[in-house]
Amino acid sequence: FRHQMTREVAAACEGAFAAGCEDLLIKDAHDSARNLIPAELPERVSIFRGWGSDIHSMMSGIDASFAGAIFTGYHSSSNTDASPLCHTMNLDNVSIRINGIQASELVINTFAAALYDVPVLLVTGDLGVCEQAKRLCPAIYTVPVSRGCGNGSISIHPAEAVKRIREKAEMAVAD
């Protein structure tokens, strides 16, 4: 899974660069925050690994200097049947709500970006999280690469996922 996640992140970076992005900071933000394989990422990126000391958790390092955010490899929130990985921040959280809204990592991280007026341009991951992204922001670009099926998932081919992510990242950044 590390190699595929790294390929998907690299594809998003390549699409962003193709659209004219000059600077990219990758926040490795799943589990140990040391999942991505840096040597397999584009040489022009910077990568933030591990957990920062600020309150933004998965969005550590964000500030008003960012023109946009891309979320790759996201999954549905806890209390859903949309992904076998569904949880919010950690497996101990049964449910997180903000103003009565089921708050997935997508919602929490979108709000963190909004604190600095940074738009979320693209979300990739399971179908459930992509549908939630569209409800949250109808103009957002999404790439569903899998869909939940009980305790399993059905995914598109890994190479097709990479292709779609690169294409949509370029479109999202250019837009």
State each model region's role.
Residues 46-49, 139-147:
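Short hydrophobic/aromatic-enriched beta-strand-loop microsegments
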Residues 1-14:
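Short catalytic helix/loop segments, enriched in acidic residues and glycine
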Residues 31-44:
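Glycine-rich loop at the start of a catalytic domain that most often binds anionic cofactors/ligands
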Residues 41-62:
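A glycine-rich helix N-cap at a beta->alpha junction
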Residues 91-116, 125-128:
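Active-site glycine-rich loop that binds ribose-phosphate moieties when present
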Residues 29-30, 72-78, 127-129:
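Short glycine-enriched loops at secondary-structure junctions
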Residues 57-60, 150-158:
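Short, charged, surface-exposed secondary-structure boundary motifs
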Residues 161-175:
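C-terminal accessory domains and tails appended to enzymatic cores
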